[in-house]
């Protein structure tokens, strides 16, 4: 055996501990099991997938485009649809939407068709969720979107729709706990160049009252419910994908001039001034506010007429309830007087029959619809005041020569 052969095993034996040294250094650099568990626990707490309260809404740009298009195509009828997304630590991520069928009923047929349309919407939503799951798309309903015109949007159909979405999520096992969100898009402001998108959620007191199903006077007093605290507004932010941002940048940036070895002169720039791909909008300087004011005033008057009719119905039911209660109280007082007279004579008292079987005492009328109509009147009046104030400012500016 040569000397080189005898030296090779020794050098190999000396070089063998190197991997062990590298592994030891890697173990020393790696965190311990306790530290890793603490890091995992902190990460889970930071990314809580199910929170108690929705604090903000993050809306995808494509979903917003679908909402705006549906509301514009359905006008003058109101458009509604379902929101799909996920709750991430109190922030509701809305990634997709789909429209709900519009029954197209008139105001006179609203009471007769309300229950059937609600069932149809629930069945349609269930079928859409099932089909979306079949194609591995987002299929987690988290709320509704509603299109409105001139600010009035709160009605019983919206409340029933939120309750139906909440029941659907709870049935599927997601445990929403009444966290349905309502996205409202005002088409009137969008037509003027100001896209208005607001998000609301039901207040806890209204959720408790809705679970009990009682909205009479005493229930509203106990839960401290008015039209102003039925919904709680939450902030909305818009999120665009990188491709959408690139597309918007391409259509809003003026096209670059062609290659030229000669620098453009001042006369060329004056003859062909650079212009943006999107023309500037001067909608805010338009003085033709008469159609908008007329529409706002007409909408406010219509809602006031509906509220007057609803108040008349509630008043009639309240008077009928008072008459039946007065008859029942008179019957009980007469029976008690007769029994007192019989006891004074030493006779056995007569049994008192149930007044609910003798008299048709109706239930106390619900004041939910009247409260919602008050909210619509408030929204329409605010919108009318804003439009009138804008018109006064523009007319004053035109009078002084500023415009």
UniProtKB/Swiss-Prot annotation:
One of its GO terms (molecular function) is metallopeptidase activity. The keyword Protein biosynthesis applies. It is found in: Cytoplasm. One of its GO terms (biological process) is translational initiation. It holds the Pfam family JAB. Component of the eukaryotic translation initiation factor 3 (eIF-3) complex, which is involved in protein synthesis of a specialized repertoire of mRNAs and, together with other initiation factors, stimulates binding of mRNA and methionyl-tRNAi to the 40S ribosome. The eIF-3 complex specifically targets and initiates translation of a subset of mRNAs involved in cell proliferation. Component of the eukaryotic translation initiation factor 3 (eIF-3) complex. This is Eukaryotic translation initiation factor 3 subunit H.
């Amino acid at each position: 055996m040569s000397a080189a052969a005898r030296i090779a095993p020794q050098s190999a034996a000396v070089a063998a501990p190197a991997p062990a040294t590298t592994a030891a250094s890697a173990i020393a650099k790696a965190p311990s099991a306790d530290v890793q568990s603490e890091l995992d626990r902190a990460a889970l707490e930071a990314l809580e997938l199910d929170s108690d309260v929705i604090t903000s809404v993050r809306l995808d740009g494509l979903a917003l485009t679908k909402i705006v298009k549906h509301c514009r195509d359905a006008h003058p009828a109101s458009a509604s649809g379902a929101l799909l997304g996920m709750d991430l630590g109190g922030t509701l991520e809305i990634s997709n939407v789909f429209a709900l069928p519009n029954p197209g009923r008139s105001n006179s047929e609203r009471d007769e068709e309300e229950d059937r349309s609600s069932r149809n919407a629930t069945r349609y939503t269930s079928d859409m969720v099932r089909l979306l799951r079949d194609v591995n798309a987002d299929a987690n309903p988290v709320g509704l979107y509603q299109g409105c015109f001139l600010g009035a949007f709160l009605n019983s159909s919206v409340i029933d729709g939120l309750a139906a979405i909440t029941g659907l999520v709870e049935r599927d096992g997601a445990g929403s706990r009444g966290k349905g969100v309502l996205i409202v898009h005002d088409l009137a402001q969008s037509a003027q160049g100001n896209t208005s998108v607001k998000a609301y959620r039901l207040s806890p007191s209204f959720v408790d009252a809705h679970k009990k199903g009682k909205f009479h006077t005493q229930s509203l007093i106990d839960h401290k419910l008015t039209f102003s605290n039925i919904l709680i507004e939450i902030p909305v932010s818009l999120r665009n994908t990188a491709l959408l941002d690139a597309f918007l940048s391409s259509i809003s940036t003026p096209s670059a001039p062609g290659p030229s070895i000669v620098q453009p002169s001042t006369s060329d720039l004056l003859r062909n001034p650079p212009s943006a791909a999107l023309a500037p909008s001067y909608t805010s300087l338009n003085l033709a506010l008469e159609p908008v004011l007329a529409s706002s005033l007409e909408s406010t008057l219509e809602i006031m007429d509906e509220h007057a009719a609803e108040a008349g119905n509630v008043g009639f039911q309240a008077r009928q309830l008072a008459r039946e209660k007065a008859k029942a109280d008179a019957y009980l007082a007469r029976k008690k007087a007769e029994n007192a007279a019989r006891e004074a004579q030493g006779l056995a008292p007569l049994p008192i029959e149930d007044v609910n079987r003798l008299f048709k005492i109706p239930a106390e009328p619900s004041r939910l619809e009247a409260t919602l109509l008050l909210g619509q009147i408030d929204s329409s009046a605010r919108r009318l005041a804003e439009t009138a104030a804008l018109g006064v400012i523009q007319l004053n500016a035109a009078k002084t020569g500023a415009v």
